[in-house]
């Protein structure tokens, strides 16, 4: 789970104004073939014997069924692997993968490699979903073929009780490559609220072996930063269906400190630079900030101000900076979501 909870390359997709999607009324048809989007769930687990069955059962209990529920046990030493095999070895709905401990990035890669669905959803083994979660996602993915990456809000439970959210309502974020590259902006959520089309998960997790040690924890950064910089079209969809457990043994939550925050910022910056190098992205991309902003149909006011900051960082005359900033402010105010 990542400690970046806050508030790709350009094209011209057919945007529509965003709205919360009702899974009860939205069609599951997509495209001329009328096929519903297929989902695979990747659950990664390490020494969470007390919680992992609850996570798996929540994935199996979805009103819209996943075609695969893949559980990757990352070398647990607390009997988790045996417990999983006791319950699911004969269950055709569940694919069990086990091996030596390699960390979260390695577990993500193993799970994604086994996925055979169009969209991959991630679930940490100490969290759980409400039964309508995949139905909410499916209603969006089915009707918006241009959307690549969707993240949700989270309801904290156990030792805390509050909601973590990006915005008050659904937001079509368009493209986020430049904002991520220049500002290290994090457009995402912890793993259990992340989903993306399979090709984006594979691209984001296609990393050198040397990254395994760095991202033993907080590998959701690889998904969030990678998909942004590589060019995914992102969407925030509050579902109210993701339960995020705070229990004192969370990988990073229980170990926050200024030192770890510093290390996370530095490693995140290096990660972003790696993805940028793959697509030939450099500092000159800031000149296209306005174009990226134009891909957002109804940007929240905070997002508008973020892009004003970007255009003011351009190496041009003050007059040209302000001219573009005013244009962004006008558009953002008119369309604000």
Over which residues does each language-model region extend?
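Short, isolated positions within intrinsically disordered regulatory regions of eukaryotic proteins
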Residues: 52, 92, 132-133, 204, ...
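Short N-terminal secondary-structure initiator segments
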Residues: 44, 51, 178-199, 282-296, ...
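Soluble, non-transmembrane catalytic domains of enzymes that act on hydrophobic metabolites at membranes
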Residues: 258-300
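Membrane-interface aromatic/basic loop that binds lipid-linked glycans or pyrophosphate carriers
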Residues: 1-18, 284-337
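Nucleotide-sugar donor-binding/catalytic module of glycosyltransferases
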Residues: 2-260
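Detector for methionine-enriched segments
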Residues: 1, 164, 196, 205, ...
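Short, surface-exposed, charge-dense and proline/glycine-enriched linear segments
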Residues: 129, 178-186, 242-249, 266-275, ...
């Amino acid at each position: 789970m990542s400690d970046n909870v806050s508030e790709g390359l350009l094209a011209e997709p057919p945007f529509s104004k965003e709205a919360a999607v009702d899974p009860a009324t939205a069609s599951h048809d997509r495209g001329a073939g009328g096929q519903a989007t297929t989902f695979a769930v990747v659950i990664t687990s390490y020494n969470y014997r007390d919680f992992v069955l609850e996570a798996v059962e929540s994935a199996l209990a979805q009103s819209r069924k996943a075609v695969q529920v893949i559980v990757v046990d990352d070398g647990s030493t607390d009997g988790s692997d045996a417990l999983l095999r006791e319950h699911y070895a004969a269950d055709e709905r569940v694919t069990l993968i086990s091996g030596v401990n390699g960390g979260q990035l390695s577990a993500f890669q193993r799970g994604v490699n086994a996925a055979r669905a169009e969209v991959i959803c991630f679930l940490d083994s100490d969290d759980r979903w409400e039964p309508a979660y995949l139905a909410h996602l499916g209603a969006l993915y089915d009707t918006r073929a241009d959307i690549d990456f969707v993240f949700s809000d989270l309801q904290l439970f156990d030792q805390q009780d509050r909601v973590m959210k990006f915005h008050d309502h659904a937001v079509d974020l368009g493209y986020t490559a430049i904002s991520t590259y220049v500002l290290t902006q994090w457009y995402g959520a912890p793993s259990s609220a992340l989903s993306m089309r399979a090709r984006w998960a594979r691209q984001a997790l296609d990393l050198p072996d040397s990254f395994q040690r760095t991202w033993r924890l907080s590998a959701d950064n690889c998904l969030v930063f990678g998909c942004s910089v590589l060019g995914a079209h992102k969407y925030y969809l509050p579902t109210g269906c993701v339960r995020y457990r705070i229990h004192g043994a969370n990988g990073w939550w229980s170990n926050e400190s200024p030192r770890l925050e510093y290390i996370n910022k530095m490693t995140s910056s290096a990660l972003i630079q790696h993805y940028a190098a793959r697509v030939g992205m450099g500092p000159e991309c800031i000149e296209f900030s306005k174009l990226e902003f134009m891909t957002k149909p109804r940007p929240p006011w905070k997002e508008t101000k973020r892009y004003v900051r970007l255009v003011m960082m351009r190496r041009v005359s003050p007059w040209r900076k302000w001219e573009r900033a005013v244009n962004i402010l006008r558009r953002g105010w008119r369309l604000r979501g």
